[in-house]
Amino acid sequence: MKKLFLILATALTVVSCHTGKQAGKPMPGADRDRHGCIASAGYTWSKVRKDCVRTFEEGIRLVPAHVKTSVAAYVIFSPDQERAEVFLPGQKKHPVLKRKGGIWKKKQYVLAKNKNGWILKTGGTDVYVSPQK
């Protein structure tokens, strides 16, 4: 009788240890990229800051110049203001523009500041601008 009770108690202990977690379901914060940034918390890697950043908190927000949409682009500057990293919606790679006088450039991208705020141009066309108040 004691052996039967011991076997039942052991079996009950083993069964109760099953946590019921679903296999393959990621835990919160488990979606770190190769730099350790947690995408689900809004972090992405910035080349110019060499750190995980939340573009919507630390960056300059730019809205589409000619299209009425809520999809914004963000610009983050290096600490010395010599480089500007542009975070465009839907793009995994972020171009890094280098300062040349009062503008930042790389290939077709030009970032400049005027009396109304910031303007990001592509191929000479205004694509993103500072939101108007």
Where are these regions (language model features)?
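Extracellular, cysteine-rich, disulfide-stabilized repeat modules with beta-strand cores
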Residues: Y43-S46
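Bacterial lipoprotein signal-peptidase II cleavage site
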Residues: H18-K25
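C-terminal partner/receptor-binding element of secreted or periplasmic proteins
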Residues: D31, L111-K133
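Mature extracytoplasmic domains of secretory-pathway proteins
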Residues: T55-K100
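C-terminal motif of bacterial Sec signal peptides marking the signal peptidase cleavage site
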Residues: V14-S16
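Disulfide-braced loops of extracellular cysteine-rich modules
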Residues: G36-S40
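Positively charged n-region of N-terminal signal peptides that target proteins for export
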Residues: M1-L4
